[in-house]
Each structure stands twice: as structure tokens, then as C-alpha cells.
């Protein structure tokens, strides 16, 4: 059973996780087998070296908490998983960049193409996206929207997945 630490959960930033019987939620990052960074508000543009955009709505307190959790997990060698905002956060903190605003994308259902040729139907509930051409060497692009925009990335090693 995996011990999962949900970053920023203790201050109310994440929704309850579905219990599958394969993981246990822990509240001490030092006890975690994996750190989860979930969806939510926009990433502060200063984290990926851009000015604040017109449509950007951030949670500076959450960013502060999650950057500290990222730094701890990286130092301790704890694998990290990023979903939606979490993937964007890991990309920014690993030196990549984001498209700060993509018009007509929030609330949009679209296909995602995968590196093995599969096609998935996904919902996009955000307007920020990872820039797949501003490569983070530790990440491999696994899936992208038809535009193409990054949808799924994985760490090349065993310590970071988004």
C-alpha cells in the first residue's frame, strides 16, 4: 500500500481522494512514498519567469506551500505526481515554461493523442498549459492535445511523474 502525501491538503486546497484500497493518505511528508500535487488555481508566472497575465488568478499561499513540499520531496528523493495544476507546477519548478493563457480551452472536452497512438477523450478545466517545446530534460511527453499542447508527461527517471 502506497503512502500518499497530498501537498496543501491540510490547508484545504485539495478535494478528498477516492479510496481504492491501494494507498493511504499521510499527513507527514516524511512518511510518504509519493507526493501528490493536485489541480487548482493558476501557477504564479514568476515561477516560470513570466510577468503576471491578464487572465491569471493565483494562490500565492498555496504556491509557497507546494514549492516547499517540492523542495523537500526532491531533496529526500520522494517521487512526485502532478495532476493538472500539479503537472504545471512540476514543469515550472523543473525549469520549463507554461502557456499562461490559452483562449477557449477551459471547460473544453477534447481528444488527447498518446505516444503509443492511442486516443483518449479528456476534459480541460483550466486555461494554463505546459509548453511541450520548452523541454524539461527529465520529462518525457506522453500525451498531447491536437493543438498540440502537453497533456501528460512523465519523469525520465523514477523520481518525478506529472
What are these regions (language model features)?
Residues 1-85, 92-99, 103-160:
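N-terminal beta1-alpha1 cap of cysteine-dependent amidohydrolase-like domains
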